[in-house]
Amino acid sequence: MALSMPLNGLKEEDKEPIIELFVKAGSDGESIGNCPFSQRLFMILWLKGVVFSVTTVDLKRKPADLQNLAPGTHPPFITFNNEVKTDVNKIEEFLEEVLCPPKYLKLSPKHPESNTAGMDIFAKFSAYIKNSRPEANEALERGLLKTLQKLDEYLNSPLPDEIDENSMEDIKFSTRKFLDGNEMTLADCNLLPKLHIVKVVAKKYRNFDIPKGMTGIWRYLTNAYSRDEFTNTCPSDKEVEIAYSDVAKRLTK
């Protein structure tokens, strides 16, 4: 009978995987660049509590060794025990499946609605920011506001586990910190990087602020900005503005 001997006293399943994350570099070629998909994977790995390394990739001069590693691939991608994985959605599924309890946190939301909350915002924002026709601006801004309002309503609506059926108190507003509760989930890793871009870019190029009356969104963003998993994986506001300097169209008659 063949026995699989543990290496260095560790069983195979107890060994830490070797993970390297490759993300888009900023304008200086070294710092974290503007890429919500890069930040999404960065946040997932950080929240999982797994040991991993991060390499920023300067797209202007992609190193030869990187082209050999993942030819024709733009970041983000990962290597997991030297195996290259390039599809962001599949990487998310893979990490959730492989880095699982009890050793690692489960990050899937409990409530399916959390996965789709805010999903239309980025498309409406893109149409708004790329438009150059003044006569179309108001309607596009209304479209963006409508999707933000929908997210705000979701964040302010109590989740089932916030409502105590035995309590006499009628809870009308949620006080949760994130989409699915008081802890970040995969849904937040997807939405927060995009929502931050909307906030920064719309202010810079359209002087548009997310209305202060949208208390759910502002509570959500404030809680995100207090977490290292978000702020330390986030590009600087300047990087976000630079990334959109050619994308954001001036309103010209």
Swiss-Prot record:
The modification N-acetylalanine is found at A2. PROSITE patterns: GST_CTER (PS50405). Keywords: Acetylation, Cell junction, Cell membrane, Chloride, Chloride channel, Cytoplasm, Cytoplasmic vesicle, Cytoskeleton, Ion channel, Ion transport, Membrane, Mitochondrion, Nucleus, Oxidoreductase, Phosphoprotein, Transmembrane, Transmembrane helix, Transport, Voltage-gated channel. Residues 81-244 form the GST C-terminal domain. SUPFAM superfamilies: GST C-terminal domain-like, Thioredoxin-like. The modification Phosphotyrosine is found at Y244. It catalyses: chloride(in) = chloride(out); thiocyanate(in) = thiocyanate(out); nitrate(in) = nitrate(out); iodide(out) = iodide(in). A motif (G-site) lies at residues 35-38. One of its GO terms (molecular function) is chloride channel activity. GO terms for cellular component: apical part of cell; cell surface; cell-cell junction; centrosome; chloride channel complex; cytoplasm; cytoplasmic vesicle membrane; cytosol. The chain crosses the membrane at residues 37-57. The modification Phosphoserine is found at S4, S132, S167, S236. Residues 2-101 are annotated as: Required for insertion into the membrane. Its main location: cytoplasm. The modification N6-acetyllysine is found at K24, K130. One of its GO terms (biological process) is chloride transport. The active G-site contains a monothiol Cys-X-X-Ser motif which mediates glutathione-dependent redox catalysis. PANTHER family: CHLORIDE INTRACELLULAR CHANNEL 4-RELATED, CHLORIDE INTRACELLULAR CHANNEL PROTEIN 6-RELATED. Belongs to the chloride channel CLIC family. In the soluble state, catalyzes glutaredoxin-like thiol disulfide exchange reactions with reduced glutathione as electron donor. Can insert into membranes and form voltage-dependent multi-ion conductive channels. Membrane insertion seems to be redox-regulated and may occur only under oxidizing conditions. Has alternate cellular functions like a potential role in angiogenesis or in maintaining apical-basolateral membrane polarity during mitosis and cytokinesis. Could also promote endothelial cell proliferation and regulate endothelial morphogenesis (tubulogenesis). This is Chloride intracellular channel protein 4. It comes from Bos taurus. The lineage of its organism: Eukaryota, Metazoa, Chordata, Craniata, Vertebrata.
